[in-house]
């Protein structure tokens, strides 16, 4: 009964607050209470009706009504505590999911940065692989080539051989020029000797003809023909006539032309033989 007396002033205050609440606030409270639609609103309405009935009754009413009110109030309180715990749990889960979202966003940003860096590393790795393949190819080609020092020695040897051959060529050219000059001089001398021999043979022939004329002069004197001295005969032979000019000079010119042709043929033959001999000497020197 003491508990009933203690709750009565509070009940009067609650009733006064409920009367003062307007319809909108009542609807908000009902929506907040009956959030999941499990009958909390009906339970509160029943509790409120019983409470108002119990408050309007006298103090000597049945205590069973009070126990029933306390039981329903405990159920409503338990439901409210459950709702509060649910709200706290939902808020905690919401904070947790918010943190997870932020964490995943940071992870996504880091993953994008890692992807970009991986792309750059991939490009660098491709370039390195390409350079390595080119290096291996060049290294294999260089490995197939002879050593630099050996190649340099071989080049120096070839240069010395080329210099020696150039010197030999110059010597052979000077030698060839000298022999050519000697050969030209020799052919000129031979030609001069041939001309002298031709002149000697012609002079001997003229002297023999003059001897024959001298032997026939006594017979001519006996027959009354003018005597001609040897000096007149020599003068006649030395003085050319128009017939001698017409017949003798072309004949001499043809002889000199034939001699020059023969001389050129012989000169070419001897020159070819000399060149062949010089080439043979050069081949022998190079082989040695």
From Swiss-Prot:
BP term (GO), one: mRNA processing
Modification type Phosphoserine: residues: 216, 229, 256, 260
Stated family: Belongs to the THOC7 family.
Region named Disordered: 196-265
Assembly behavior: Part of the THO complex containing HPR1, THOC2, THOC5, THOC6 and THOC7.
Coiled-coil ranges from the UniProt annotation: 95-178
Pfam families in alphabetical order: THOC7
UniProt feature, compositional bias: Acidic residues: 219-235
Name by which UniProt lists this protein: THO complex protein 7
Compositionally biased intervals (Low complexity): 201-210
Predominant subcellular localization, coarse grouping: cytoplasm
Comp. bias regions, Basic and acidic residues: 244-261
GO cellular component: cytoplasm; nuclear speck; nucleus; protein-containing complex; THO complex; THO complex part of transcription export complex; transcription export complex
Function: The THO complex is required for cell proliferation and for proper export of heat-shock mRNAs under heat stress.
Subcellular location: Cytoplasm; Nucleus; Nucleus speckle
Superkingdom as given in the UniProt entry: Eukaryota
Alphabetical keyword list: Coiled coil, Cytoplasm, Nucleus, Phosphoprotein
Organism: Drosophila melanogaster (Fruit fly)
